[in-house]
């Protein structure tokens, strides 16, 4: 199958039954292969949603400069989406972000700015807001942007419901910005209020 643009390949990822799970449970456990998205993660969905919806509302236009604080997959996805849609983008991250992620972002044409490890993501977000106040770019603000969970309410959630035939009892998701778990759970709970939602994060996580 051929697609005219890369954004049309985002989403509709496959569900795969996990066969080798610990314990003796007979429950069916499915994993959704979000790594099959073109930039390699579930973050492709909100990245496109935030840019496309802001553009549709007339808040930004191709050629504008976008700014975002991110040290992970959202940055890679935003760099891809910005390149495809004709935006410049500056990504701000702590200096201890992985070299592999930095390389992926720059490969898509993003400009990177580092803050110190001690400043962390809070410092990166502060700098992004300062740049916006100085007219140096438009902050997408993945942490507070409703277009983040909207991507999962309109896409990921309906896909899961469709591909399970509605036969889902639990949804389990990691939590970062919480866009995935908020959007998917909102949709699934509308279909069946009895579905259980389980959020996971590292014991020492800051989310």
Task: Say what each PLM segment does.
Residues 1-207:
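PLP-dependent amino-acid enzyme catalytic core
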């Amino acid at each position: 199958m051929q697609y005219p643009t890369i954004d049309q390949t985002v989403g509709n990822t496959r569900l795969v039954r996990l066969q080798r799970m610990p314990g003796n449970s007979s429950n069916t456990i499915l994993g959704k292969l979000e790594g099959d998205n073109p930039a390699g993660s579930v973050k492709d969905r909100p990245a496109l949603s935030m840019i496309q919806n802001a553009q549709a509302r007339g808040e930004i236009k191709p050629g504008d400069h976008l700014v975002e604080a991110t040290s992970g997959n959202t940055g890679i996805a935003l760099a891809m989406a910005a390149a495809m849609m004709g935006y410049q983008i500056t990504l701000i991250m702590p200096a201890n972000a992985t070299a592999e992620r930095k390389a992926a972002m720059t490969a898509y044409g993003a400009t990177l700015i580092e803050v110190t490890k001690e400043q962390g993501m809070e410092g990166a977000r502060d700098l992004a807001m300062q740049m916006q106040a100085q007219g140096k770019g438009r902050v997408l603000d993945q942490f507070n942007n409703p277009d983040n969970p909207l991507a999962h309410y309109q896409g990921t959630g309906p896909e899961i419901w469709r591909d399970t035939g509605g036969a889902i009892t639990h949804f389990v998701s990691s939590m970062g910005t919480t866009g995935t778990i908020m959007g998917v759970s909102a949709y699934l709970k509308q279909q069946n209020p009895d579905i259980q939602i389980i959020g996971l994060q590292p014991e020492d996580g800051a989310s």
